[in-house]
Amino acid sequence: AKAELQFDDFAAPLINDKEAADEADIIARRILPAEDIIHDREKSLGADDFADFLAVTKGVYTFIGTHNPDNPDTGAAHHNGHFDIDEKAMLISCNLYVDYAIAYLNGEFNK
């Protein structure tokens, strides 16, 4: 048997800018207890086109947990027909991104 294989590289590796990650950590610590902030998340083979943005500008990609142990229906992974987000997690992510933007625009991270 013969086969031809064409491999298309669809996404660049997603690597956070260290400075932006440190800034996001400052903001996250204002919103969440330190024990709820994970810095050494296991590497993933998943892909995201956000990597294309990080190739040209400083930025940070975060994971916000959406599982509530008190509600087992929220335990399914994303892109799963049973996925049901704990809407409280949306408040955390909104606060993180809005507070980061405000701090940035107010010059808090200027060195």
Residues covered by each model-derived region:
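Metal-dependent amide/peptide-bond hydrolase catalytic core
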Residues: 1-111
